[in-house]
Structures are given as C-alpha cells and as structure tokens.
C-alpha cells in the first residue's frame, strides 16, 4: 500500500512541478506578481491573519507547529514562510507548502505498516458529553486555522456550536491588498488569497 501511495504521489508532484516551473520561470508572470497586493507583517499581525496569507507576509502562524496533534507531535514541524506579502509570495508559498507536505507524507510512509484489522472504530453516537463545558479545537486547514467551539448544558447536551473559518480573518487582508491598486490587480489579489465567500459568514 505504501509503495502505491508513493508512486501516485510522485506522479502528482512531477506534474505539479511542470506547472510551477512554467509559472515561476516566466519573467512576464513574475513581474506581474511581484509587488502586487502587498500586505505587511504588521498589518497581518494586527488583523489576526492565518494560513498562507499570514505566512506569506512573514507571520509564521501554523496550528501544526503551535498546537501539534497526532503525527505532528512526533516531528519538529516548521512551516514555510516568506516576507514580501505580495501575490508572488502567496503563490510561491503554496509551492513550498506542497514540497513540505510531500516530504512529511514520505517520512510518515517510512513507518507505515498498512491498515490494521479495524481501520476506524465505529462511532459511539450515544456518548454523553461532559456537562457545563466549553470545548475548543484547532486544525490547520488548507486556508489556515479552523476553530470549533462547543458549549454543553447541565445535561451534557450541545447548547451551542460555532465554527470559525480562516476567511473570517483574511478577507480584511484582501481589502488592504487592493487598496489604491488598479482594477486589473483585483483578480490577481483575490485569487492569491483564494478565500471562502460562505466561510466569512460562519
């Protein structure tokens, strides 16, 4: 199984590299991306930016490093980051993250013995939650930090549940990135952040 995963992943990375080589070796694209839609590290910090948008501005914020879980507890995970905070940084950082993810997966496959007799235990749908409790969880999604908050009542039933999408923080970054820019810069900036429209309302 591990060999099959490696083979498929190598093929994906090879094809992905073909695309990124074309993009990042093209002087016309590079000149269009550089210094477009810049957001400083100070602005990113003040807005509570997360994910690629934060790390492209030099704010090295990543839940996998700050709150490691599962396999991340056994490795010294250090997220990639850049400092220019422009369209180029946000795009190129995604390439660096793909390279890093490839490395992480390959390292994990070294000790992979295949699935056990039971891949995943059957969920206990009748499990009772702790009473009068606030639970918070964090996960690094592909856009950045996702937080889940659940509040239980005196009987252990869910009283309230809230999910915060990373786009809640980063939409304001996009507004800063396009401030004073040409109309033609908007599509580049918008897609360099690649935010969720519905996620802003969660």
What does each model-found stretch correspond to?
Residues 1-202:
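Active-site bordering "gate/hinge" segments
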């Amino acid at each position: 199984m591990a060999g099959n995963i490696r083979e498929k992943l190598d093929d994906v990375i090879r094809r992905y590299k073909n695309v990124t080589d074309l993009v990042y070796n093209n002087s016309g694209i590079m000149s269009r991306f550089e210094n477009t839609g810049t957001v400083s590290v100070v602005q990113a910090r003040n807005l509570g930016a997360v994910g690629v948008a934060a790390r492209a501005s030099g704010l090295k914020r990543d839940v996998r490093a700050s709150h490691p879980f599962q396999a991340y507890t056994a490795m010294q995970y250090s997220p990639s980051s850049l400092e220019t905070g422009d369209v180029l940084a946000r795009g190129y950082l995604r390439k660096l993250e793909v390279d890093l993810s490839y490395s992480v997966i390959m390292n994990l496959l070294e000790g992979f013995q295949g699935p056990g007799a039971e891949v995943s235990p059957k969920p206990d749908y009748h499990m009772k939650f702790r009473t009068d409790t606030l639970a918070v969880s964090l996960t690094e999604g592909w856009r950045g930090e996702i937080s889940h908050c659940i509040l239980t009542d005196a009987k252990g039933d869910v009283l309230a549940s809230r999910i915060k999408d990373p786009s809640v923080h980063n939409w304001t970054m996009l507004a800063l990135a396009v401030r004073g820019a040409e109309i033609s810069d908007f599509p580049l900036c918008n897609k360099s952040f690649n935010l969720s429209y519905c996620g802003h309302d969660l």
